[in-house]
């Protein structure tokens, strides 16, 4: 039987529960060790228990008291930015070698977008998965960046209000700050801006994302081809990820410049507009929750690579 790395998930809400189901169904080098929550009545803990996963409703302290804790090598944190700082400190003290995959906007460790820099931080003890909006849009910014210098990138992530749990709602400010920074650090834009919209529409709408970039003038065919290749790469682990329509281009000439607050008063260049839709796999919430699916799929993709590295080191 193939050896697997045991993982614990902190946070038994929407994201944590969806991730658990993905690991149980599709984990190749990762297997569930424990599900951690703070609400003994949470649906996530109840599901985990029914599926034979060790549980605790006593938070990370409870995790350290579980017999399986000694076997845990990877911990996913699907709580909140503030909670992750405390969880990281406590677990790092108890088990310094733990690998933590942070699904909150805390960003203690380096940003990780699997299709852009997924192999760059496999030895880091803590990696940050940015945000759902970041996972959907930063690959597109990077796709433009590898063709032309991007001076400014702005993303708007629209998600169904029903798919946003208390953790997401508590982290709106952190969402915009972390995503904006990652657009620059990982996406390659000189300046980034992120906006999130919680859409209350009924029936719930799928996740929609819009990406605008202002870059140096470049061959639009090359940009379009780069964007399509990147979309295909994301689709390899998020099947519901797709371009909603063809990429649009506008030339902003020097004799008719635009003003971008905080960036420049007389900007010109090539404006690229990319429109995305993310349909979820419906492992936990229905298919409209693509924001859930892209975040947990990216986290699992990252964990599989970390696990491969850990298992290879044991063999060596």
UniProtKB/Swiss-Prot annotation:
It is an enzyme of class 1 (oxidoreductase). GO terms for molecular function: acetaldehyde dehydrogenase (acetylating) activity; NAD binding. NAD(+) binds at residues 12-15, 163-171, 291. The keyword Oxidoreductase applies. Its EC number is 1.2.1.10. Gene3D superfamilies: Dihydrodipicolinate Reductase, domain 2 (3.30.360.10), NAD(P)-binding Rossmann-like Domain (3.40.50.720). It catalyses: acetaldehyde + NAD(+) + CoA = acetyl-CoA + NADH + H(+). CDD domains: ALDH_C. GO terms for biological process: catabolic process. Keywords: Aromatic hydrocarbons catabolism, NAD, Oxidoreductase. It comes from the Bacteria. The active site is at 132 (acyl-thioester intermediate). Belongs to the acetaldehyde dehydrogenase family. HAMAP family: Ac_ald_DH_ac (MF_01657). This is Acetaldehyde dehydrogenase 1.
